[in-house]
Amino acid sequence: MSKTAVPPRVGVVMGSDSDWPKICAVGAALDEFGVPWEARVMSAHRTPDAVREYARGAADRGLKVLIAAAGGAAHLAAAVAAHTTLPVVGIPVPTPDLGGLDSLLSTVQMPGDVPVASVAVGMGGPRNAGLFAVQILATSDPALEQQLRAFKRQLQDQVAGSNQALNEALRGAGSGGTAQQ
């Protein structure tokens, strides 16, 4: 969790503490942008009352975005979304039996009128969940928006550098191929 005295703006909930190593990139992404956050373990199936109370009280505590990670019968994001008006991002956690397909389908197959934004299963998903929360917050935070713009420029520069390095490698290998700009 962010080590600041500032109240958290993002809440991260997971179905089990064993999910944390698989989703810790969400916290790293939030920390990268200086967004304070909190994390909790709660289960849609084992502690439904705790999930309901957490989701219902989140906005009153100053949270602006909720991120819910679960594997298997991954109903945590849905349970959270049912009890809040805040944006909810679901992270489908990979599972040993089906590689996370079960988690993905449970997270994305929401009924109408109960929206949950979902990210990918695997390594990119948790980071994207954190970045998506940052983008949501940036809609009302000009300083955070500027950080995001700088981040996007940095990504563009990295790709341009990779393209240039590829062109140089192709020329050095005597290849007739080129990597287009």
Range-by-range predicted roles:
Residues 2, 8, 21, 37-39, ...:
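Acidic, glycine/proline-rich low-complexity segments that act as flexible tails and inter-domain linkers
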Residues 7-46:
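Glycine-rich phosphate/diphosphate-binding loop of Rossmann-like nucleotide-binding domains
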Residues 19-23, 48-51, 70-79, 98-101, ...:
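Short glycine/serine/threonine-rich phosphate/pyrophosphate-binding segments
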Residues 39-60:
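N-terminal beta-loop-helix "entrance" segment that forms/cooperates
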Residues 54-92, 96:
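Glycine-rich phosphate-binding loop
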Residues 137-181:
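Glycine-rich phosphate/pyrophosphate-binding loop and the adjoining helix
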